[in-house]
Amino acid sequence: MKLVDEAEILVTAGNGGNGCVGFRREKFIPLGGPDGGDGGNGGSVWIVADENVNTLVDFRHERAFKAQRGENGMGRQAYGKGGEDRVIVVPVGTVVMNVQTDEIIGDMTQHGDRLLVAKGGKGGLGNMHFKSSVNRAPRQSTTGEEGEERLLKLELKLLADVGLLGFPNAGKSTLIRAVSAATPKVADYPFTTLYPNLGVVSVEAYRSFVIADVPGLIEGAADGAGLGTQFLRHLQRTRLLLHLVDISPMDGGVDGVSPVDQVRTIERELERHDPALLEKPRWLVLNKADLMFPEEAQAAAEAIVAELGWTAPWYLVSALGRDGTFPIMKDVMAFFDRQREDELEARNAG
C-alpha cells in the first residue's frame, strides 16, 4: 500500500448570521417595541480520527472544506438557525499543523479523537438588545462575525509495528514482499521505494503485525539528503526496527560502503534526527546471503557482528529466496507477545 502521507487543506468556518431589525406589529399594538432576533452562529470545522481510514489520498482531490453560514435573525425575536458543522475524517496517527505558524494543533492518536480546527463566527445581535430608556425604537443591529479560516498541513505517521531501515538496495522491499502480501516495486537502483509501503505479516491464524518498508537512508538523511527527513519520521511510532544490511561482496558493499559502515552511518542519522530512535529495539538482518557460498556468508556475518559489537538479535537471510525470513517473523511475533504480557502486568500492578 502506498501511503500519501502529507496534504495541505484550507478550512473555513461559517460566518455568523446577521441580527435583525424588527418591530412588534400586531392588531391594536401599532407602536410595538423592537423584536429583531439574533443571527445564528456559523458552523465550525472539525477533524475526526477514524481507524477505518488508512490514507490521506482523498485530499488530492478535495482541498477546501467550508462549514455552513448561520442564518440571519428574524422578527418576533426569532433567532437564526446555526450553520452545520463540517467534519473532516482522517486516519488515526494524523498530525495536524497550522501552515502559517508551523504550530502543531493536534495529534490524532486514537479512534474518535475530535479536533476543532476552525470555529464558526458568532451570530449578530438583533435590535431587541439595543432598547433603552432613551431609545425605545432602536434601528441598530450587528452583523455576524466571520468564521475562522486556516491553512492546515496533515501529516500521517505510520502506525506500523515494525519498521525496516537500511541503505538503498539493502533488500527491504524484497523482504516485505517475501513475508507479506504487499507488492512494492523492486529494482536494482537506489530509491526504488519512493513511498512508504505497509504489509500485514500473518504468522498464524489471528496473529499478525504490520510492517513498514520506508525508502532507503543514506548519509545526510537527517538533513534531507536522498529521501531524508520525509521518511525518517515514519520510524518514530514503530515498536521494533529491523536493520537490513547487504553483506554481498560486490564493490565491498552497497556503493562501496562496507556492511559495518552501512550500519554506523544509519545509526548516526537516526541519532541526529531523533536520539530516541536509537533506544528502540533494533535487530540486525544480514541480507543477500544467496550471493555467497553458505560458509562464506556465515563467516562474513559473524565477522560483521563481532566488529559492530552487536548484542541484540541478528539473522542471516536471503530475502529473494525467502531463506531465513520466516524465523524472523516468528521471533517478532513472540517479541510482541512478551511486550503485551509485560504491559498487562504493569497495568494490573498499577
From Swiss-Prot:
Broad class of where this protein is predominantly found: cytoplasm
GO cellular component, one term: cytoplasm
Residues the record lists as binding Mg(2+): S173, T193
GO biological process: ribosome biogenesis
Entry keyword Electron transport: no
Residue span(s) of domain Obg: 1-159
GO molecular function list: GTP binding; GTPase activity; magnesium ion binding
Domain OBG-type G: from-to ranges: 160-337
Cofactor: Mg(2+)
Alphabetical list of CDD domains matching this protein: Obg
Cross-referenced PROSITE patterns: G_OBG, GTP1_OBG, OBG
Keywords: Cytoplasm, GTP-binding, Hydrolase, Magnesium, Metal-binding, Nucleotide-binding
Localization of this protein: Cytoplasm
Binding locations of GTP: 166-173, 191-195, 213-216, 287-290, 318-320
Superkingdom, taxonomy of origin: Bacteria
Documented EC number(s): 3.6.5.-
Keyword GTP-binding: yes
HAMAP family hit by this protein: GTPase_Obg (MF_01454)
Its job: An essential GTPase which binds GTP, GDP and possibly (p)ppGpp with moderate affinity, with high nucleotide exchange rates and a fairly low GTP hydrolysis rate. Plays a role in control of the cell cycle, stress response, ribosome biogenesis and in those bacteria that undergo differentiation, in morphogenesis control.
Subunit text: Monomer.
Entry's family note: Belongs to the TRAFAC class OBG-HflX-like GTPase superfamily. OBG GTPase family.
Name by which UniProt lists this protein: GTPase Obg
Annotated source species: Xanthomonas campestris pv. campestris (strain ATCC 33913 / DSM 3586 / NCPPB 528 / LMG 568 / P 25)
